[in-house]
């Protein structure tokens, strides 16, 4: 029985779901905004918010934990150096979900998920 199990399965196996969210976290940190389905955006918010909260305190343990979730050193560096300073005084709610209509092919509800302080975060050239 599936009683009291939170989170949606999104019609994927657990390995596929974990890999998909790992890729989505990397894309969101690198680009600060991504377009996806509404249900994936809501599920992604539950994954990215704790990572940003962890990145506020720069310790080796937190860096290793975030690396284990993302498997990307560039993402870890960007989270700790560029993104977390803008969210230091914010207690939560680091992402915003904006609905953007329906997908043409299958009529799925689409949404943008973005970092709230996205305009202030400096782009490294």
From Swiss-Prot:
The gene is rplQ. Transmembrane segments: none annotated. The lineage of its organism: Bacteria, Pseudomonadati, Pseudomonadota, Gammaproteobacteria, Enterobacterales. This is Large ribosomal subunit protein bL17. It comes from the Bacteria. Belongs to the bacterial ribosomal protein bL17 family. Pfam families: Ribosomal_L17. Keywords: Ribonucleoprotein, Ribosomal protein. GO terms for molecular function: structural constituent of ribosome. GO terms for cellular component: cytosolic large ribosomal subunit. Part of the 50S ribosomal subunit. Contacts protein L32. One of its GO terms (biological process) is translation.
């Amino acid at each position: 029985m599936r009683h009291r199990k939170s989170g949606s399965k999104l019609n994927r196996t657990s390995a596929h779901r974990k890999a998909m969210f790992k890729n989505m976290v990397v894309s969101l940190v690198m680009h600060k905004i991504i377009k996806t389905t509404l249900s994936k955006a809501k599920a992604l918010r539950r994954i990215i918010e704790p990572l940003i909260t962890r990145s506020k305190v720069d310790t080796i343990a937190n860096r290793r934990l975030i690396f284990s979730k993302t498997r990307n050193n560039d993402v870890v560096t960007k989270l700790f150096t560029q993104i977390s300073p803008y969210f230091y005084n914010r207690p939560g709610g680091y992402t915003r979900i904006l609905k953007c209509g329906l997908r043409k092919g299958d009529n799925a509800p689409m949404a943008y998920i973005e970092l709230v302080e996205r305009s202030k975060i400096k782009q490294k050239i």
